[in-house]
Amino acid sequence: MLDKLDRLEEEYRELEALLSDPEVLKDKGRYQSLSRRYAEMGEVIGLIREYRKVLEDLEQAESLLDDPELKEMAKAEREALLARKEALEKELERHLLPKDPMDERDAIVEIRAGTGGEEAALFARDLFNMYLRFAEEMGFETEVLDSHPTDLGGFSKVVFEVRGPGAYGTFKYESGVHRVQRVPVTETQGRIHTSTATVAVLPKAEEEDFALNMDEIRIDVMRASGPGGQGVNTTDSAVRVVHLPTGIMVTCQDSRSQIKNREKALMILRSRLLEMKRAEEAERLRKTRLAQIGTGERSEKIRTYNFPQSRVTDHRIGFTTHDLEGVLSGHLTPILEALKRADQERQLAALAEG
């Protein structure tokens, strides 16, 4: 393990040097990427330095065990240092877990209204706004790729891109069924209803990831539609792309340009096909007990937003907060950090089982 720690410290020193390099400072994109990596490494570097200090202190304590006058004190100190050493090793193991190479990619996020009619569409809008605020808080850029608004201002479906280093790794734990419990605006009796929305998060695929065979793709053009199915455009700018071998269908209508909608639709299709390929590989690995996925199945109910109790519960890890307003305002970091830690613990357990 010490060799890995040496390499991390060397990388950290190299990053420090690069961040003060005038050429790097001129390149905003590269500077931001290096700064993010430097900030990410801060915690593990602190742990490494503490670990090395514990090893030094442990060596010193053991050298005093033969001294009759200091033996008892050295013995007590040695026990405390051994306990701290073990705790630090567990923390470092977590940081040294292999990262998903897709984590640094941009993300495609799709939110679909589920059961609950118009209330589900309004909940989909709430989730969309929550993610936009969270993305802004994290320094990511967002762009709506496709949206289908409803009469009361909700969304039956909305797809958007999150751009920035680590976007997919940040958002991936949001995949699954989200449930809301509240009194809908359409409810006249004051009864609490339960509605759902499904979130899918995909790593953005690059052209080299998945070569699309255009002979296997059907592209239809149509007029964009608004709430209630009414036309909002007098030109055929909306695009529907169908991947014939899998039946995957993607529509895009947010741009007035048919060409831009076509490009966006193909990009989403490529990302879905890449995710399908990744899911098949993950299933194969899971069956052979070589890996586990901690991001939740899409059919699984992952989180409940209970308005009467101002409570948010993530069912995957039993995490509960009563700051519903804060969560919907985009303060997702405590939940996502807890999910990330639980995922790492599962990976460590899987490695321990061999």
Swiss-Prot record:
One of its GO terms (cellular component) is cytoplasm. The keyword Disulfide bond does not apply. GO terms for molecular function: translation release factor activity, codon specific. Methylated by PrmC. Methylation increases the termination efficiency of RF1. Keywords: Cytoplasm, Methylation, Protein biosynthesis. The modification N5-methylglutamine is found at residue 230. The keyword Cytoplasm applies. It is found in: Cytoplasm. PROSITE patterns: RF_PROK_I. Belongs to the prokaryotic/mitochondrial release factor family. Peptide chain release factor 1 directs the termination of translation in response to the peptide chain termination codons UAG and UAA. This is Peptide chain release factor 1.
